[in-house]
Design a protein with these regions (language model features):
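C-terminal motif of bacterial Sec signal peptides marking the signal peptidase cleavage site
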Residues: 16-20
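Cross-family detector of peptidyl-prolyl cis-trans isomerase
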Residues: 2-6, 21-172
Length: 172
């Protein structure tokens, strides 16, 4: 019985020793979340103001360029240059297209022919959503605001941050 009591006391003291030596995990200060939330809120407000300013610039540009431009629900402008009676483009569909990208000053940035799968995010968001409005064989012009194109990062030396882009598209 004495051996059992000694063993029990030894086990209890060893377990107390090990449990008291563990470090508690560091905790964030209670007000840390408020600072982060405020910064995010400020960034969102700045981005909304920039987007609103860009929208007014693009509206003026679109209406001055051609009265046929329409504004989409998500914020890009488009017009169908050559309409067809083909089928509407759908998600997961393979499309071959000719694409010329231009600055708002009408300087050519890039011209290429490519094959893409709709919905695979191979193009900027605004252009991919715009293609879903077209029928096979159509040609169209899109004015994509920076926040639906390459955003605040741009694309290398060719497309600077916060740059809106015009795309002239021909679907095959």
């Amino acid at each position: 019985m004495l051996k059992v009591c000694k063993f029990f006391l030894l086990t209890l003291s060893v377990s107390c020793l090990f449990s008291s030596c563990t470090k508690t995990a560091p905790q964030l200060p209670a007000n840390k979340g408020n600072v982060v939330d405020k910064n995010i809120s400020n960034l969102m407000e700045v981005n909304q103001k920039l987007a609103a300013k860009e929208d007014s610039i693009l509206m003026a540009f679109a209406t001055k360029t051609d009265a046929k431009f329409k504004k989409s629900e998500i914020g890009f402008w488009y017009k169908v240059d050559v309409p067809t009676n083909g089928e509407l483009i759908k998600d997961k569909e393979v499309c071959k297209l000719s694409c010329t990208s231009l600055s708002l000053e009408m300087k050519v940035i890039q011209t290429e022919t490519m094959q893409i799968v709709i919905g695979k995010k191979q193009l900027v968001v605004g252009l991919e959503e715009g293609l879903k409005l077209l029928h096979k064989g159509e040609s169209a012009t899109f004015i994509i605001p920076w926040y639906l194109a390459y955003g605040r990062n741009g694309k290398g030396s060719r497309i600077k941050p916060y740059t809106s882009i015009i795309y002239q598209i021909k679907l095959f």
